[in-house]
């Protein structure tokens, strides 16, 4: 095999795409900062018990594992940064009030999580800790929408759900983990036949409720249908009222509901949201509430947030037009260097043509040139 061939679903990022990614990264972090979120940078690898605490089987299978040559302990390359940020909040910051944190960095997956996806996403996310009310859920949705607007994503729609509905149905019956996984998979896939088989050993009331949940997706009328179909489910009124309140603050946006949407990581414990875009084949943002995510670190705190893959956004958003550069001759004189430095300080891109390469095509598009006229350096338009 050729030495330059990369593993499947791993790719180099070339200059034009790298510029686009970096512009989005800066813009997303600045947008989060505008809401008061502080940037943190967790490490690329951690001990497995820290990375995978409370995350479920799906994330375990997505995590690359190896042995630390220093300690002999098992460590993993992160597949998701949510647990890492929860650890930072719980032990390193240890604040008592509301804490807002954001992050951006590469994660690694053993398998792509969607068709044609990279196994090295560039994950951006934001988390708010310390507030259990609907306001934190809503802020997460609004920040995610503002991030997509900044990126130029069009045709956005929001899908709302809540992990407590199905969890409340299954908790009293103590179903085994294999059955629970089958039920969750059937609900996520909207597979009525598989759901019927997976829930065959459950009480009849639970089976009826699960079958009802499978059909509870669509516009706001779904909430009224859920009140009737799930009237015997404890806490369902609170769940539905919370979803209705979040949707009310998203007036003017396309909002739908899907009480069987259980896709994504298993640590969600309350309201969830998924954001879709016109040109994307899969969700561009997943988020919600995960109050139990810090329990493994000895400090359970209310938490809500979201994450997205910047590389996925690059595939659906056209890059901004690159400002044309100034072409300059190579001039080893102090006055030329000073003038070029002034131009660069003013935000201009100045590309110096190295000796012997004057006739070669430049990597940057140039529409002006630096010339020396009557002993003075000046910028003039390139003749075409």
From Swiss-Prot:
InterPro entries (UniProt xref): aa-tRNA-synth_II/BPL/LPL, HisRS-like_core, HisRS/HisZ, HisZ
Q: Which CDD domains match?
A: HisRS-like_core
Q: Where in the cell is it found?
A: Cytoplasm
Q: Which GO terms describe its cellular component?
A: cytoplasm
Protein's GO biological process: histidyl-tRNA aminoacylation; L-histidine biosynthetic process
One example of the protein's molecular function in GO is: histidine-tRNA ligase activity
- Pfam families recorded for this chain? tRNA-synt_His
- Similarity comment: Belongs to the class-II aminoacyl-tRNA synthetase family. HisZ subfamily.
What is the designated name of this protein?
ATP phosphoribosyltransferase regulatory subunit
Please give the organism: Paracidovorax citrulli (strain AAC00-1)
């Amino acid at each position: 095999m050729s030495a330059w061939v990369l593993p499947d679903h791993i790719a180099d990022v070339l200059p034009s795409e790298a510029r686009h990614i970096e512009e989005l990264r800066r813009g997303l972090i600045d947008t989060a900062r505008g809401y008061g979120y502080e940037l943190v940078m967790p490490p690329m690898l951690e001990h497995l018990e820290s990375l995978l605490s409370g995350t479920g089987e799906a994330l375990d299978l997505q995590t690359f594992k190896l042995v630390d040559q220093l300690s002999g302990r098992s460590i993993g390359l992160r597949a998701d940064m949510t647990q890492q940020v929860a650890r930072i909040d719980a032990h390193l910051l240890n604040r008592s009030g509301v804490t807002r944190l954001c992050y951006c960095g590469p994660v690694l997956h053993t398998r792509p999580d969607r068709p044609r996806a990279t196994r090295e996403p560039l994950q951006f996310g934001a988390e708010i800790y310390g507030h259990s009310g609907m306001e934190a859920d809503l802020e997460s949705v609004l920040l995610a929408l503002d991030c997509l607007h900044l990126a130029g994503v069009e045709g956005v729609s929001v899908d709302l759900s809540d992990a407590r509905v199905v969890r409340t149905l299954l908790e009293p019956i103590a179903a085994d983990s294999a059955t629970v996984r089958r039920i969750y998979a059937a609900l996520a896939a909207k597979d009525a036949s598989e759901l019927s088989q997976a829930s065959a050993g459950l009480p009849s009331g639970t089976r009826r409720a699960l079958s009802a949940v499978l059909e509870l997706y669509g516009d706001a009328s779904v909430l009224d249908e859920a009140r009737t179909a799930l009237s015997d489910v404890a806490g369902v009124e609170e769940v539905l009222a919370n979803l209705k309140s979040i949707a009310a603050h998203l007036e003017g946006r396309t909002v739908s509901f899907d009480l069987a949407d259980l896709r994504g990581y298993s640590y969600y414990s309350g309201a969830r949201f998924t954001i879709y875009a016109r040109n994307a084949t899969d969700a561009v943002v997943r988020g919600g509430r995960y109050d139990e995510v810090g329990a493994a670190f000895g400090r359970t705190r209310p938490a809500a947030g979201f994450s997205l893959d910047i590389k996925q956004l690059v595939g659906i958003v056209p890059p901004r037009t690159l400002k044309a550069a100034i072409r300059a001759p190579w001039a080893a004189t102090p006055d030329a260097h000073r003038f070029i430095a002034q131009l660069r300080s003013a935000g201009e891109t100045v590309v110096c043509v190295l000796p012997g390469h004057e006739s070669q095509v430049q990597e940057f598009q140039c529409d002006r040139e630096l010339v020396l006229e009557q002993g003075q350096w000046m910028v003039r338009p390139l003749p075409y």
